Amino acid sequence: MITRYKPESGFVARSGGPDRKRPHDWIVWHFTHADNLPGIITAGRLLADSAVTPTTEVAYNPVKELRRHKVVAPDSRYPASMASDHVPFYIAARSPMLYVVCKGHSGYSGGAGPLVHLGVALGDIIDADLTWCASDGNAAASYTKFSRQVDTLGTFVDFDLLCQRQWHNTDDDPNRQSRRAAEILVYGHVPFELVSYVCCYNTETMTRVRTLLDPVGGVRKYVIKPGMYY
C-alpha cells in the first residue's frame, strides 16, 4: 500500500500520488477523537452523524445543525437524505474544519493530540458497492453541489486548491474555504474493514490506537504525521 501525499494539504493517494485522472486511488479521511474508537470497533462500522452519539464530540455544532438540513441529491435515483445521514470524508485531510477543531471552539478544546485520521481509498468505497457522492465544497453550504460521477470527479472538485496549503477566502475568490472542504459522503455507514490507513498526531495517541485496533485484525498502515494536523 504505497502512498504519496501533498504535505501542504494532506491530499493522499496510492501509487504516484494525487492525480485528477485517478480518483479511485485517492485516500479520503474521516477524523474523530480517539475516545470514539471503542464504539466504532464495537459497531464494526463508521456510522452517519444522524445514527450515532459520539463519546467525545469534536464537531462544531452550528455546522452540524446545517448538515441536518442540507439535502444531498446528486441525481434523481439517490436516496432521499441529508448531509448528516452520511459518513463524511475529506479529500484533503488538512481541511478548514480540522483547523477549527484543532484550534478549539465552543464545544471542543482538546487540540490535535487526541484526534485520529481514518483513511479509506475511494476505489474501495466504490468496489464495496456503498452509496456515495462527492461534494464540490463544504457539504453544509447552501451553494454546494453533489456528484457521483467518478470519471469526472477530478474536474468536479477544485483539484488544484485541494493540493495547496493556503485556503483562506480572498476578495477575488470568496469561496476558496468552502471548495477546500470538498468531501466524499457515504450514505449510512462504512464497514470498518475498509479503513486501511490510520494517522495520528503523536506517539501517545498512536499507542492508544494500536492497543485498540491491533486485536481487530485487518491490514492497515499506521503513521504518525503531525503535519496532517494543525
Curated annotation (Swiss-Prot):
It comes from the Bacteria. Toxic component of the hybrid type II/IV toxin-antitoxin (TA) system DarTG, which plays a crucial role in controlling bacterial growth and bacteriophage infection. Its toxic effect is neutralized by cognate antitoxin DarG. ADP-ribosylates ssDNA, preferentially in the motif TTTW. In case of phage infection, DarT toxin ADP-ribosylates DNA, which inhibits both viral DNA and RNA synthesis and leads to abortive infection. GO terms for molecular function: DNA binding; glycosyltransferase activity; nucleotidyltransferase activity. InterPro entries: DarT. This is DNA ADP-ribosyl transferase. Residues 54-70 are annotated as: NAD(+)-binding element. It catalyses: a thymidine in DNA + NAD(+) = an N-(ADP-alpha-D-ribosyl)-thymidine in DNA + nicotinamide + H(+). Coiled coil: none annotated. NAD(+) binds at H30, F31, T32, G39, L47, R67. The NAD(+)-binding element stabilizes the ADP-ribosylating turn-turn (ARTT) loop which confers substrate specificity; both domains contribute to ssDNA-binding. Residues 26-230 form the DarT domain. Its EC number is 2.4.2.-. The active site is at R67, E183. Transmembrane segments: none annotated. Induction: Part of the dnaB-darT-darG operon. Belongs to the DarT ADP-ribosyltransferase family.
